């Protein structure tokens, strides 16, 4: 009978234990390495996806949506086709072509109530709009889909920009520096027609520059960009986007700032003040003279 050496058995046991530990360590290393590789791979894939994925195009998706364009076409066929033609090509002696005017021009005209016109006249005047903002954007999308042109200004979340257009440095409050720059630009480019406070004025041939108070920020921006009716166009090469915003800041600041001298008399400056002095002041003096004469 063969005898077992205790030292040999002990050595064999240690060898097996050591081999098992090595095997476990290798297994642990493989597990850790696999987890790290998976983590690095997923992280790299995420970074790569972020890098190659374009920015959110919420606004573009809204404007290019086929259902929105179809809705706009239906509205166009009801209200616009008579004057602007079946294919937006315009109708002689009725309405101009809309090809290439862009959604900005449509928004200004329709949202301000100028279009559809109630009657043919020298100039379309502002009135209560016939269509809601959503319907207006649908018509604008249809026109933009057939010729392109200047677009509306949207926020990053896809909403239509309004107060965000109040100055190039707007952060919830109008920046006084924007108002100062906007005032200089307004007096240089706009005051000759709209008056230095934006209250409008008469032009030739029965036309006029409208009061700017009722216009919202998007309307003012699009008016500068598209040049409706008698107004010149101010492209981004003539007035940059920030300069347009600064002009809007000046207009809104002028409207919302109380007159330190009391009633502003329409904001027409020396004209209205002089008329008040002659029309009211002289009458008061005449009445006072007559009263003094009757007492003597």
Swiss-Prot record:
Residues 1-27 are annotated as: Disordered. It comes from the Bacteria. One of its GO terms (molecular function) is heme binding. The gene is qcrC. PROSITE patterns: CYTC. This is Cytochrome bc1 complex cytochrome c subunit. Heme c 2 binds at residues 190, 193-194. The cytochrome bc1 complex is composed of a cytochrome b (QcrB), the Rieske iron-sulfur protein (QcrA) and a diheme cytochrome c (QcrC) subunit. The bc1 complex forms a supercomplex with cytochrome c oxidase (cytochrome aa3). Residues 67-147, 177-255 form the Cytochrome c domain. Residues 1-19 have a biased composition (Polar residues). The chain crosses the membrane at residues 32-52, 274-294. It is an enzyme of class 7 (translocase). The keyword Electron transport applies. Pfam families: Cytochrom_C (PF00034), Cytochrome_CBB3 (PF13442).
